[in-house]
Amino acid sequence: MSELIVSRQQRVLLLTLNRPAARNALNNALLMQLVNELEAAATDTSISVCVITGNARFFAAGADLNEMAEKDLAATLNDTRPQLWARLQAFNKPLIAAVNGYALGAGCELALLCDVVVAGENARFGLPEITLGIMPGAGGTQRLIRSVGKSLASKMVLSGESITAQQAQQAGLVSDVFPSDLTLEYALQLASKMARHSPLALQAAKQALRQSQEVALQAGLAQERQLFTLLAATEDRHEGISAFLQKRTPDFKGR
């Protein structure tokens, strides 16, 4: 049985974490499969958006502790996981997390890495690494504080406490909360809506949004303007404006 189920709905790629016995713990093998699928999707012009989900009880409950327990300092220094996370971060198309149940530790970090997080009412988000004598190591401290602010992020990281889907939405980590049996359906609807837009515009807009968290305002504004200008030379820009003026649905080609 595959630990990552891959399916397609038109221009949307769906990746389902499938390690139920391990609560979808993100071991190196599963991370590598995620990386491979996303890197293939990045260059596949027939794919515009990707959705990552788990099961009804667990999005992903963290890293694989059995795998971690085997590593001493030397093994940790030579761990490939930082490179795998960097490759996930480099995905250039919209990435949506559809979260039901627990998103803890590395599972929460995976959700934070996504562009949009939608959650079921039963979802919980947390970084409990402190209870194990360690700390988040895959972007949790950096992305959580940018998402929910200093006070709540510090409380979660330093106490190990998790928050509900409703609290996550109020804090800005989650965009929408739904009955748990509708979470994936809504995420796929949102992905399909995004996928109707110009692939070039989607990628440029994602790049600009990401830059806003990584550079100073003036540098971000300059990058935004550069990307806006580059889109002016595309066929999709001409098609989008023409379709609007002619009151018809645009037919974007990604050119």
From Swiss-Prot:
Top-level enzyme category: lyase
Entry protein name: 2,3-dehydroadipyl-CoA hydratase
Effect of inactivating the gene: Mutants accumulate delta3-dehydroadipate and are unable to use phenylacetate as a carbon source.
Pathway: Aromatic compound metabolism; phenylacetate degradation
Keyword Cell wall biogenesis/degradation part of the UniProt annotation: no
Catalytically driven reaction(s): a (3S)-3-hydroxyacyl-CoA = a (2E)-enoyl-CoA + H2O; a 4-saturated-(3S)-3-hydroxyacyl-CoA = a (3E)-enoyl-CoA + H2O
Native organism: Escherichia coli (strain K12)
GO CC, one annotated term: catalytic complex
Induction / repression: Activated by cAMP receptor protein (CRP), integration host factor (IHF) and by phenylacetyl-coenzyme A (PA-CoA) that prevents PaaX from binding its target sequences. Inhibited by PaaX.
Superkingdom: Bacteria
Disulfide bond positions: none
Family: Belongs to the enoyl-CoA hydratase/isomerase family.
